[in-house]
Regions:
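Transmembrane alpha-helical segments of multi-pass transport proteins
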Residues: 45, 248-310
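Alpha-helical transmembrane segments of multi-pass membrane transport and lipid-handling proteins
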Residues: 119-170, 203
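Junctions where cytoplasmic loops transition into the N-terminal start of transmembrane alpha-helices
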Residues: 37, 41, 76-84, 117-133
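Short runs within selected transmembrane alpha-helices of multi-pass transporters and secretion channels
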Residues: 1, 159-185, 189-209, 214-236, ...
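Helix-terminus/linker motif at the lipid-water interface of multi-pass membrane proteins
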Residues: 46-87, 108, 148-152, 270-278
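Residue-level signature of transmembrane alpha-helical cores of multipass secondary-active transporters
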Residues: 33-49, 82-85, 89, 129, ...
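Helix-loop junctions and terminal segments of transmembrane helices
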Residues: 88-113
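Short alpha-helical transmembrane segments in multi-pass integral membrane proteins
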Residues: 1-7, 14-26, 121-141, 147, ...
């Protein structure tokens, strides 16, 4: 009896040890999986911050090699990084918020093998980003560039904004596609694409800026955003045969942008003519530019909500 009792106790102890070992093994496995996906994201953020620090040093230094004085080189960098880019990145607050919501949705669909749901999410997110990007591009060219130059009292803000406006669709779509790839456990791939884009920007700083000035850096920004967005798209196309919808994602946003801008211009001219006897208004004033932007966005949203993109 004593021996049986001792054996039972030993068996219980062995079971506890095995359970503890299996729990520790599972914990180790979970930690490895989390690290596998978290490290590329952390590396991506780290490299981005390191590049921004290096960029603050490289741009003025390369502009001095180009022939600008020290003061003009620093001033040019300040105009690009402190005035132009914040204007371009302002609408990305919408896409960044959307990408935060996309990641868990795509991750859930991927875990239960709902490919059709992932494809639907892809279509909807790209459609929204293309509408936002093309409309933003039109507004930057027509109004926001002039508004920024007026507010900052710096005419070159307008020129730089016009040059960089074309990256808006690629920049916003890239954010959503990167979030979707992260949700599909492709964090290492998105990190590699980001490093590729950063390498192009660094190469443009080193190779182009000493020869053609700040335009070389702008060209590097444009090329890197287009290339990284294209790489994200190609990867998703290989996985889900995600085909571009040219009509809904390019032609329709462009048409709606033209309609919205034209309608707001006509409406503002009518309002200006009616109120001219009370308060003189000019189409180049800050009030007029802000009114055009707000009215164009309002008209665009109204039309967008009435159009069926399925």
């Amino acid at each position: 009896y004593v021996n049986n009792k001792q054996n039972n106790k030993n068996n219980k102890n062995n079971k506890i040890i095995r359970n503890n070992n299996s729990c520790s093994a599972r914990k180790t496995s979970y930690i490895r999986v989390i690290a596998l996906y978290a490290l590329p994201l952390n590396l991506n953020s780290l490299l981005l911050h390191l590049f921004e620090s290096a960029e603050a040093i490289l741009i003025p230094a390369q502009l001095i090699i180009y022939g600008l004085s020290k003061e003009n080189a620093v001033s040019t960098y300040g105009i690009i990084s402190g005035m132009t880019l914040p204007l371009l990145l302002f609408p990305s607050a919408i896409t960044n918020s959307m990408s935060v919501m996309l990641l868990p949705k795509v991750s859930e669909d991927n875990s239960v093998q709902r490919s059709s749901s992932v494809i639907t999410t892809l279509h909807q997110s790209v459609n929204i980003c293309m509408h936002l990007g093309i409309m933003s591009c039109v507004l930057f060219i027509l109004y926001i560039g002039r508004l920024g130059a007026t507010l900052f009292h710096e005419p070159s803000v307008y020129n730089y904004t016009i040059m960089l406006a074309c990256i808006c669709p690629f920049l916003y779509v890239r954010t959503s596609l990167a979030s979707i790839l992260n949700g599909l456990n492709m964090t290492a791939r998105t990190c590699a694409y980001s490093i590729t884009g950063l390498a192009i920007r660094i190469a443009s700083l080193i190779l182009l800026v000493p020869g053609i000035g700040i335009s070389g850096y702008i060209y590097g920004l444009i090329i890197s955003n287009i290339l990284v967005c294209t790489l994200h798209y190609i990867k998703l196309y290989k996985m889900y045969h995600f085909k571009p919808d040219i009509i809904n994602n390019i032609i329709t946003p462009l048409s709606l942008s033209i309609i919205a801008v034209t309608s707001s211009n006509i409406a503002l001219r009518l309002i200006t003519s009616l109120l001219s006897c009370v308060t003189p208004l000019t189409l180049n004033s800050i009030f007029s530019l802000c009114a055009n932007i707000l009215l164009s966005c309002l008209i665009y949203i109204i039309i967008y909500s009435k159009v069926d993109f399925t």
